[in-house]
Amino acid sequence: RTKDYCGKCGRKSFGKMQDIDFFYEKGKLEVCTIVKEPTNKFTKLGAYIYGIISFHNGKVRVPGRLTDHILKDEELALSCIEDREVVPRFRRRYAVEQSDIIPTISLAFTFADEYYPYQKHEVVKPNKKYETPGIVGYGVYVSKFRIKEDSIERSIPFMDEDSITAAVEAGKLALIHSGVDPSLIGKVYVGSESNPYAVKPIASKVAQVLKLGEEEKSDGVQGVDAVDTEFACKAATSMFKDAAALTYYPTAHIPYAMVIGTDNSQAAPRDEPGGELDFFVGYGASAFIFGMHDVIAELEGWYSCTSDTPDFWRRDLEPYPRHGGRFTGEPAYFKHIAKSAKKLMEKLRLQPSDLDYFVCHQPNIRFPIKVAKELGFKEEQYIDGLQVVKFGNTYSGASPIGLAAILDKAKPNQRILVASYGSGAG
């Protein structure tokens, strides 16, 4: 965020400056330099590029750091990257001690034509109203960096990323995709089990950066209800029905609700107890906007089941989760996924052949394929949602990212069954 002003007189009009948010805009890297010996707070970044970025055809200039860029030992010709277009990214500002507040900034930058290309944010007025609520828009964010092993790739965060930054980026993409006015979002849920804070919500940061709800500029607050949820890997999907119900309930006065699943999935080193998880953990987030207008996927029904099954856990103050070995399979994952999917199909009087797509929680490659086959689904029904092979197990983002992949190609009147799972268990 910065101020737009006249380069000659220093005023916008009538002696007032205009408050502008550049987070959705595209700029140009005018000049830059390489910081080869960062100060203590930036040491973990290594050498990085710092420059001047201009917006609005050079009328506004701000300093900024180029992120997602690893400088090699060889010299980089700065003239090759100057004058290239860049887009703002939400990142950690610099490294701090474990007990400190994490500083963030929405004006770190990446090149506009790389990985996540620039997309214009255009607010569209609500048009058609549906009888039942559903998904209005969605967005997925995963890092550009990967670790590839055998048949799986795992997304890993850059040094200035975490579950908070991924949540903001996914929410931003959902707003761009839907065209929804951020001020009309009255509720935001963020589900995660890797919040960098033990006590401090992610949702409040998302609401502030994305300007969700009516903005009270004088007080610096957003008129939105923001809350974090936690239930292992189903922390986000469990809020789908709550978000949809709120937009349907007339006296709630909530036109739209946003649900985000975000995780920087954790695992112990491979030579320690619980280290088997490290073969599959990934990083990413997905965001869905629910409402009654311009619905792209209606919510037809749901079913949930829960049991106190200790198949996966992390005790307070412990850095890594533990799991119950083979106990995480039949008595936990498979039982709950199969039970919920069968009961929902029974409730809606559907057979697997009546559905076009099936997506479920994806802790690895084998589990979702096995449960899909046991339920009677064919490969063409579940393969498109199997995103664990590209990004790893993104925990709270896993089945939602699979759903987003299916929505990318699904056609009108096709049916999708989503069966999420959270260890603990439900």
Label each PLM-derived region with a short phrase:
Residues 29-72:
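Glycine-rich active-site loops that engage anionic ligands at enzyme catalytic sites
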Residues 1-24:
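Cys/His-rich short segments
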Residues 81, 89-121:
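OB-fold/S1-family single-stranded nucleic acid-binding modules
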Residues 154-162, 194-256, 262, 370-402:
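Conserved catalytic cysteine-centered active-site region
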Residues 170-186, 338-354, 375, 410:
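Phosphate/pyrophosphate-binding loops at sites that engage ATP/ADP/AMP, CoA/4′-phosphopantetheine
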Residues 17-28, 79-84:
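Short coil-to-beta-strand transition motifs
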Residues 69-89:
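Short nucleic-acid-contacting surface segments enriched for D/E, G, S/T with interspersed K/R
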Residues 118-161, 273-331, 335-342, 347:
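Condensing-enzyme catalytic core mediating Claisen C-C bond formation in acyl metabolism
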